[in-house]
Amino acid sequence: MSNLIEIKSKSTHTATVIFLHGLMDTGKGWETRMENIISMGGLDHIKFVLPTAPTIPISINFGNKGTAWCNVTAFYPGSEEDLIGLEKSMKLVEALIEEEIKNGIPAERIILSGFSQGGALTLYTGYQSKHKLAALITLSGFSPSLSLPSKIKPENKDIPLTMFHGTDDKVVNCKWGELSHKSYLKVGIKNSQFISITNLDHSSNEFELKQVHDLIEKYLPK
Protein backbone atom coordinates (compact mmCIF):
# COMPACT_ATOMS: atom_id res chain seq x y z
CA MET A 1 0.00 0.00 0.00
CA SER A 2 1.42 3.42 -0.95
CA ASN A 3 1.86 6.22 1.59
CA LEU A 4 2.03 3.70 4.43
CA ILE A 5 3.45 5.17 7.64
CA GLU A 6 5.09 2.73 10.04
CA ILE A 7 6.29 3.75 13.49
CA LYS A 8 8.69 0.98 14.44
CA SER A 9 8.73 -0.52 17.92
CA LYS A 10 11.54 0.71 20.15
CA SER A 11 12.18 -2.78 21.56
CA THR A 12 11.45 -6.30 20.26
CA HIS A 13 8.30 -6.11 18.14
CA THR A 14 5.57 -8.31 19.69
CA ALA A 15 2.34 -6.43 18.88
CA THR A 16 0.85 -4.04 16.32
CA VAL A 17 -1.72 -1.25 16.19
CA ILE A 18 -3.27 -0.50 12.79
CA PHE A 19 -4.89 2.96 12.78
CA LEU A 20 -7.24 4.17 10.02
CA HIS A 21 -7.63 7.92 9.40
CA GLY A 22 -10.84 9.76 8.55
CA LEU A 23 -12.22 11.29 5.35
CA MET A 24 -9.84 13.51 3.33
CA ASP A 25 -6.92 12.75 5.64
CA THR A 26 -3.80 10.57 5.49
CA GLY A 27 -1.90 8.18 7.70
CA LYS A 28 0.73 10.91 8.00
CA GLY A 29 -1.93 13.17 9.47
CA TRP A 30 -2.15 10.94 12.54
CA GLU A 31 1.55 10.20 12.97
CA THR A 32 2.20 12.90 15.59
CA ARG A 33 -0.81 11.83 17.67
CA MET A 34 0.30 8.21 17.60
CA GLU A 35 3.78 9.32 18.66
CA ASN A 36 2.15 11.23 21.53
CA ILE A 37 0.43 8.02 22.61
CA ILE A 38 3.73 6.12 22.45
CA SER A 39 5.44 8.81 24.54
CA MET A 40 3.01 8.09 27.40
CA GLY A 41 5.04 4.94 28.04
CA GLY A 42 4.71 1.19 28.15
CA LEU A 43 4.30 0.66 24.39
CA ASP A 44 7.90 0.18 23.25
CA HIS A 45 7.11 -3.34 21.98
CA ILE A 46 4.37 -2.14 19.63
CA LYS A 47 4.60 -1.12 15.97
CA PHE A 48 2.03 1.38 14.68
CA VAL A 49 0.84 1.06 11.08
CA LEU A 50 -0.93 4.08 9.54
CA PRO A 51 -2.21 3.46 6.00
CA THR A 52 -3.66 6.09 3.68
CA ALA A 53 -6.98 5.50 1.94
CA PRO A 54 -7.33 5.42 -1.86
CA THR A 55 -8.10 8.68 -3.71
CA ILE A 56 -11.64 8.51 -5.09
CA PRO A 57 -14.49 10.87 -6.10
CA ILE A 58 -16.47 11.81 -2.97
CA SER A 59 -20.12 12.79 -3.30
CA ILE A 60 -20.17 14.90 -0.12
CA ASN A 61 -17.20 16.81 -1.61
CA PHE A 62 -19.20 17.68 -4.76
CA GLY A 63 -17.66 14.73 -6.58
CA ASN A 64 -14.13 16.05 -6.18
CA LYS A 65 -11.47 13.46 -5.48
CA GLY A 66 -9.98 12.92 -2.05
CA THR A 67 -8.76 10.18 0.24
CA ALA A 68 -11.62 8.02 1.48
CA TRP A 69 -12.17 4.42 2.49
CA CYS A 70 -15.47 4.53 0.57
CA ASN A 71 -17.75 7.12 -1.01
CA VAL A 72 -19.80 9.32 1.34
CA THR A 73 -23.09 11.00 0.46
CA ALA A 74 -23.92 12.30 3.96
CA PHE A 75 -22.99 11.76 7.60
CA TYR A 76 -26.22 10.53 9.17
CA PRO A 77 -27.87 7.14 9.82
CA GLY A 78 -29.52 5.58 6.80
CA SER A 79 -27.62 7.63 4.21
CA GLU A 80 -26.67 5.87 0.98
CA GLU A 81 -24.05 3.19 1.59
CA ASP A 82 -21.05 2.45 -0.62
CA LEU A 83 -20.78 -1.24 0.18
CA ILE A 84 -18.51 -1.89 -2.81
CA GLY A 85 -16.05 0.70 -1.53
CA LEU A 86 -16.25 -0.69 2.01
CA GLU A 87 -15.53 -4.20 0.76
CA LYS A 88 -12.52 -3.01 -1.24
CA SER A 89 -11.10 -1.15 1.76
CA MET A 90 -11.79 -4.09 4.05
CA LYS A 91 -9.58 -6.20 1.78
CA LEU A 92 -6.81 -3.60 2.05
CA VAL A 93 -6.97 -3.70 5.85
CA GLU A 94 -7.15 -7.49 5.89
CA ALA A 95 -3.96 -7.53 3.80
CA LEU A 96 -2.24 -5.37 6.43
CA ILE A 97 -3.38 -7.73 9.18
CA GLU A 98 -2.15 -10.74 7.22
CA GLU A 99 1.22 -9.07 6.61
CA GLU A 100 1.66 -8.67 10.37
CA ILE A 101 0.67 -12.30 10.96
CA LYS A 102 3.11 -13.41 8.25
CA ASN A 103 5.83 -11.50 10.10
CA GLY A 104 5.15 -13.37 13.33
CA ILE A 105 2.56 -11.20 15.09
CA PRO A 106 -0.54 -13.28 15.94
CA ALA A 107 -3.99 -11.78 15.36
CA GLU A 108 -4.65 -11.65 19.10
CA ARG A 109 -1.70 -9.22 19.36
CA ILE A 110 -3.15 -6.77 16.81
CA ILE A 111 -5.48 -3.87 17.60
CA LEU A 112 -7.51 -2.22 14.84
CA SER A 113 -8.50 1.39 15.46
CA GLY A 114 -9.66 4.43 13.53
CA PHE A 115 -11.11 7.93 13.48
CA SER A 116 -14.49 8.85 11.93
CA GLN A 117 -14.75 6.97 8.60
CA GLY A 118 -11.66 5.04 9.70
CA GLY A 119 -13.60 4.05 12.80
CA ALA A 120 -16.46 2.88 10.62
CA LEU A 121 -14.05 0.72 8.60
CA THR A 122 -12.58 -0.58 11.86
CA LEU A 123 -16.00 -1.91 12.83
CA TYR A 124 -16.76 -3.22 9.34
CA THR A 125 -13.46 -5.09 9.08
CA GLY A 126 -12.92 -6.15 12.68
CA TYR A 127 -16.24 -7.92 13.09
CA GLN A 128 -16.14 -9.68 9.71
CA SER A 129 -12.45 -10.56 9.67
CA LYS A 130 -11.31 -14.17 9.54
CA HIS A 131 -8.74 -13.13 12.14
CA LYS A 132 -9.86 -12.59 15.73
CA LEU A 133 -8.13 -9.40 16.84
CA ALA A 134 -7.08 -8.19 20.29
CA ALA A 135 -9.47 -5.22 20.36
CA LEU A 136 -11.30 -2.59 18.31
CA ILE A 137 -11.12 1.11 19.24
CA THR A 138 -13.00 3.89 17.44
CA LEU A 139 -12.80 7.67 17.77
CA SER A 140 -15.84 9.58 16.47
CA GLY A 141 -16.81 6.36 14.70
CA PHE A 142 -20.14 4.99 13.54
CA SER A 143 -21.67 1.89 12.03
CA PRO A 144 -20.94 2.15 8.29
CA SER A 145 -23.78 -0.12 7.23
CA LEU A 146 -27.23 -0.89 8.60
CA SER A 147 -26.60 -4.51 7.63
CA LEU A 148 -23.30 -4.85 9.51
CA PRO A 149 -24.75 -6.19 12.80
CA SER A 150 -26.23 -9.14 10.92
CA LYS A 151 -22.85 -9.86 9.23
CA ILE A 152 -20.80 -10.12 12.43
CA LYS A 153 -19.02 -13.45 12.70
CA PRO A 154 -20.09 -15.29 15.87
CA GLU A 155 -16.47 -16.00 16.79
CA ASN A 156 -15.71 -12.25 16.72
CA LYS A 157 -18.53 -11.18 19.03
CA ASP A 158 -16.34 -11.16 22.12
CA ILE A 159 -13.60 -8.95 20.64
CA PRO A 160 -13.37 -6.00 23.08
CA LEU A 161 -14.84 -2.80 21.63
CA THR A 162 -14.46 0.77 22.87
CA MET A 163 -16.14 3.66 21.05
CA PHE A 164 -15.12 7.22 21.99
CA HIS A 165 -17.20 10.18 20.83
CA GLY A 166 -17.22 13.92 21.50
CA THR A 167 -20.50 15.38 22.73
CA ASP A 168 -20.01 18.45 20.50
CA ASP A 169 -19.28 16.54 17.29
CA LYS A 170 -21.11 18.38 14.49
CA VAL A 171 -19.90 16.07 11.69
CA VAL A 172 -20.75 12.64 13.09
CA ASN A 173 -23.32 13.35 15.78
CA CYS A 174 -22.56 11.72 19.12
CA LYS A 175 -26.06 10.23 19.12
CA TRP A 176 -25.22 8.33 15.91
CA GLY A 177 -22.18 6.84 17.57
CA GLU A 178 -24.28 5.87 20.58
CA LEU A 179 -27.00 4.31 18.40
CA SER A 180 -24.32 2.38 16.51
CA HIS A 181 -23.01 0.99 19.79
CA LYS A 182 -26.51 -0.01 20.88
CA SER A 183 -27.03 -1.86 17.60
CA TYR A 184 -24.01 -4.04 18.45
CA LEU A 185 -25.26 -4.68 21.97
CA LYS A 186 -28.51 -5.98 20.48
CA VAL A 187 -26.67 -8.67 18.49
CA GLY A 188 -24.58 -9.88 21.40
CA ILE A 189 -21.50 -7.63 21.48
CA LYS A 190 -21.25 -7.59 25.29
CA ASN A 191 -17.58 -6.79 25.86
CA SER A 192 -17.98 -3.19 24.75
CA GLN A 193 -18.28 0.36 26.01
CA PHE A 194 -19.32 3.74 24.64
CA ILE A 195 -17.50 6.71 26.16
CA SER A 196 -18.72 10.24 25.44
CA ILE A 197 -16.21 13.06 25.95
CA THR A 198 -17.70 16.36 27.08
CA ASN A 199 -17.06 19.43 24.89
CA LEU A 200 -15.04 17.49 22.30
CA ASP A 201 -15.92 18.21 18.66
CA HIS A 202 -15.02 16.13 15.58
CA SER A 203 -11.42 15.73 16.64
CA SER A 204 -9.32 14.19 19.38
CA ASN A 205 -7.75 15.64 22.53
CA GLU A 206 -5.17 14.68 25.14
CA PHE A 207 -7.77 13.12 27.42
CA GLU A 208 -9.05 10.85 24.65
CA LEU A 209 -5.55 9.91 23.49
CA LYS A 210 -4.62 8.98 27.07
CA GLN A 211 -7.66 6.68 27.24
CA VAL A 212 -6.60 5.10 23.93
CA HIS A 213 -3.08 4.63 25.30
CA ASP A 214 -4.40 2.88 28.40
CA LEU A 215 -6.52 0.52 26.30
CA ILE A 216 -3.58 -0.37 24.05
CA GLU A 217 -1.45 -1.05 27.12
CA LYS A 218 -4.24 -3.22 28.55
CA TYR A 219 -4.92 -5.32 25.46
CA LEU A 220 -1.33 -5.53 24.17
CA PRO A 221 0.76 -5.99 27.33
CA LYS A 222 4.48 -6.65 27.13
From Swiss-Prot:
One of its GO terms (cellular component) is nucleus. It catalyses: S-hexadecanoyl-L-cysteinyl-[protein] + H2O = L-cysteinyl-[protein] + hexadecanoate + H(+). Disulfide bonds: none annotated. GO terms for biological process: fatty acid metabolic process. Its EC number is 3.1.2.-, 3.1.2.22. The keyword Lyase does not apply. The active site is at residues 116, 169, 202. It is found in: Cytoplasm; Nucleus. It comes from the Eukaryota. It holds the Pfam family Abhydrolase_2. Keywords: Cytoplasm, Fatty acid metabolism, Hydrolase, Lipid metabolism, Nucleus, Serine esterase. The keyword ATP-binding does not apply. GO terms for molecular function: carboxylic ester hydrolase activity; palmitoyl-(protein) hydrolase activity. Hydrolyzes fatty acids from S-acylated cysteine residues in proteins with a strong preference for palmitoylated G-alpha proteins over other acyl substrates. Mediates the deacylation of G-alpha proteins such as GPA1 in vivo, but has weak or no activity toward palmitoylated Ras proteins. Has weak lysophospholipase activity in vitro; however such activity may not exist in vivo. Belongs to the AB hydrolase superfamily. AB hydrolase 2 family. This is Acyl-protein thioesterase 1 homolog 2. The lineage of its organism: Eukaryota, Amoebozoa, Evosea, Eumycetozoa, Dictyostelia.
